[in-house]
Amino acid sequence: MTAPVNRYAILILSAASLGTTAAHAQSSVTLYGVVDDSIAYVNNQQGHSNVYMRDGNLYASKFGLRGDEDLGGGTHAIFDLQAGFNLNTGAQAAAGTIFNRQAFVGLRNVRYGTVTAGRQYTPYFLFVGPYASSSWLTGATGAHPGDIDGLDTTIRVNNSVTYTSPTFAGLTASAMYAFGGIAGATGKGNTFSAALRYANGPIGIAAGYLRINSSGSSAGFQNPATAASGSFAVSVLNQGYLTAKAVEQVAAAGNYTLGDLTMGLNYSNVKYLPGNGSAFTDTAVFNTYGALAAYRFTPTFSVAGAFAYTLASKANGVASAARYQQYSLKESYSLSKRTTLYALQAYTHSSGQTLGAQGAGHIVDAAPIVGDSQQLTPSTTRGQFVGMAGIAVTF
């Protein structure tokens, strides 16, 4: 066996052992996860059609250990360790990192809220994401093109501390700060996020803010030593702006449920801010407007659809601003509480121009990509279609 396999086996066996002994201390450790796989078709993937296996579409394939110990007085010690993997190869989702998705520990109190520390999702994602199209139609085909606004699960933050308030009259607030960890440069590589949510009956609304400061090194946002830890989404939409000194994301989304019908609207504004060492000079802005609807026809069968329109700014020598229009559909059928069959279809059309990977002076036609399933495999035409059919099992 390889070392990663041995580590996984030890963790699973340890979890099973803890689960049988933890009851004496009024605590629990739960092993959970998802296995998800599909057959995917793309009409144009860098100039060629492709039929291939793709895992983690409805839900990312993963397993985790979740712990909770009752300390008394309404206070609990909690932790969550979550690892992603490729179901088709058995490989870790991120080489060299076991718990790449999240790994945190903290305290939760019913009166005072929750404090957690470790590698975590941002309040921006945790609050706004559930009301966005990526939650209802999957990130693979439902995330806004390239997941440009991070409303799918692409950004995970190292060295972070998060506080989440209790819920008062439907309102919940959360804030995160992540240390960059660069000696002598406290303003580089760090991350800040805050979000507010209101949920009451059929109405759910959230707004969030996220700022990621670059490490200042040649690796920029892909520097594994800094807060964003290489989890920042890279696609043909933003590859010309990865030398930015910082990225700011603001988003708001809301859902309204009427019986079996749910409708939603969402908006995001993303800015790539240039610095002294950036390969572009003007702030690049992406505004995305989205709408969604989902209907449960029976307790086991549901359908969802979404539309997104992303408009980039006209700057850095670009004469015609890039535009992306995406149409997404999802059909799902539950065989049981744990097993779901699903089908996904999406089409993205692009127009205008953007910067290529070399930055300013390298202007290229904006290439279409569907959701976050084709990040660096765009169509060579102005349109890209993706279809998938798969199965997901939770445990």
Protein language model features and the residues they cover:
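Gram-negative bacterial Sec-dependent N-terminal signal peptides
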Residues: 1-25
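Outer-membrane beta-barrel and related beta-rich outer-membrane complex signature
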Residues: 45, 91-93, 127-133, 217-221, ...
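Extracellular loop and loop/strand-boundary signature of outer-membrane beta-barrel proteins
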Residues: 48-51, 91, 147-148, 180-181, ...
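Outer-membrane beta-barrel "beta-signal"
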Residues: 335, 379-395
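Outer-membrane beta-barrel proteins
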Residues: 16-22, 63-71, 109-113, 166-169, ...
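Short sequence motifs at beta-strands and strand-loop junctions characteristic
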Residues: 55-58, 95-97, 153-155, 186-188, ...
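Outer membrane beta-barrel
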Residues: 26-41, 52-183, 188-211, 346-350
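Detector for outer-membrane/organellar transmembrane beta-barrel domains
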Residues: 195-334, 345-347, 382
